[in-house]
A protein has these predicted regions:
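Residue-level micro-sites within transmembrane alpha helices that shape
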Residues: 7, 21, 165, 169-171
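Catalytic Zn2+-binding segment of zinc metalloproteases
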Residues: 168-183
Length: 345
């Protein structure tokens, strides 16, 4: 199966999940799929938003990094969604995308340690996985990217940079910071995909993504936690404004139909989406901008911490056909596991 066919299948698979699967929390810590006809859930930030965030982050980088990142901009854009592809096939991937801050009675640094080792000493790895790992995953992936820069490993730089952009973007989504991640606890099922997929697709073309130049991050762990707490601070507005607008408009005017990939699908109506987006007063734009800036900052920081290798020189290196084959085989293995994975309750 070539890469184009693979990507088409993954797209159809994910939309199948959206239309026919409700994502619920299995007993040992991941949000996994359980078939439940007629209930929908979108992938994180949506493919569109994740890809745009990685692409736009490139333009925050300094001139020294630009030859390499501009050359590989298509790779970084296309592969921004790899973690979402893996989350259905790779054990342990799903918790890396979120953290349920409301699962902890106290989120102070003393009670909820900011470093993973300290947190596992306090709660154990299973509890942490149950409630999500995204701030710790950002820290880990940051160190991995720094090492890839240090080794001047082109393939690893690209793969890890794309993944890091994904996790950072997820950390900036309010609904990735709560157990009520899809409104399922408040009768607002579907709000996850509405906020992070439908709204960006409809309105992000008008957003201002001039976020300034990438800056060095002195404390990656502190920055990761600032992101999730900042996103969580917006959660009340996300839920309350949707609930209030639904009460005013009514369920019958809340939804409409749209054509996607030749299928007629139920979506949030354009008028409802516009009014909700207006009430949020730029919230989605702010979170996307924060994601773009943070991704650029972390890429830049990894490069600096690795000793600022010559990226113009690395840009001249061609990726070998063997490396392409290995990557293609890896993605095919994700596909095989999609069919062999059992359902988990």
């Amino acid at each position: 199966m070539n890469r184009q066919m693979y990507n088409r299948f993954i797209w159809l698979f994910v939309w199948g999940v959206i239309f026919f699967v409700e994502t619920v929390r299995p007993s040992y810590g991941t949000r996994g799929p359980v078939c439940r006809p007629g209930v929908a859930r979108q992938p994180q930030w949506g493919f569109y938003a994740h890809q745009q965030i990685n692409r736009l982050a490139i333009f925050t980088l300094p001139a020294e990094m630009m030859p390499f990142f501009k050359k590989h901009s298509q790779y970084l854009t296309d592969n921004a969604v790899n973690p979402d592809k893996r989350r259905y096939a790779v054990v342990g991937e799903a918790p890396r995308h979120f953290i349920d801050l409301d699962a902890y009675p106290d989120t102070s640094a003393v009670t909820l340690p900011r470093f993973y080792k300290d947190a596992t000493d306090r709660y154990g790895p299973d509890t942490l996985a149950l409630h999500g790992l995204v701030p710790w995953q950002i820290q880990l992936t940051k160190y991995q990217l720094t090492e890839a820069f240090r080794q001047q490993n082109v393939r690893q730089i690209l793969r890890i940079a794309a993944d890091l952009g994904h996790y950072i973007a997820d950390a900036n989504v309010p609904l990735h910071t709560t157990r009520n991640y899809n409104g399922q606890l408040t009768g607002q099922q579907g709000i996850h995909g509405f906020w992070e997929s439908r709204l960006p697709e409809l309105f992000s073309k008008d957003y201002d993504f001039l976020v300034g130049s990438a800056e060095y991050v002195p404390s990656p762990q502190r920055r990761a936690w600032q992101a999730v707490f900042g996103a969580n601070a917006a959660l009340d507005s996300v839920l309350r404004m949707e609930r209030d607008l639904t009460g005013e408009i009514g369920e019958t005017r809340k939804f409409g139909f749209d054509e996607r990939n030749g299928l007629t699908t139920k979506v949030y109506a354009s008028d409802f989406s516009q009014r909700y987006h207006d009430r949020l007063s730029g919230q989605v734009e702010r979170q996307m901008r924060a994601s773009v800036k943070m991704v650029g900052d972390f890429w830049f920081t990894c490069w600096v911490d690795a000793g600022q290798p010559d990226m113009a020189k690395l840009a001249k290196r061609a990726l070998s056909s063997d490396e392409d084959l290995v990557e293609a085989e890896e993605q095919k293995s994700w596909l095989k596991r999609l069919f062999s994975a059992r359902e988990e309750n």
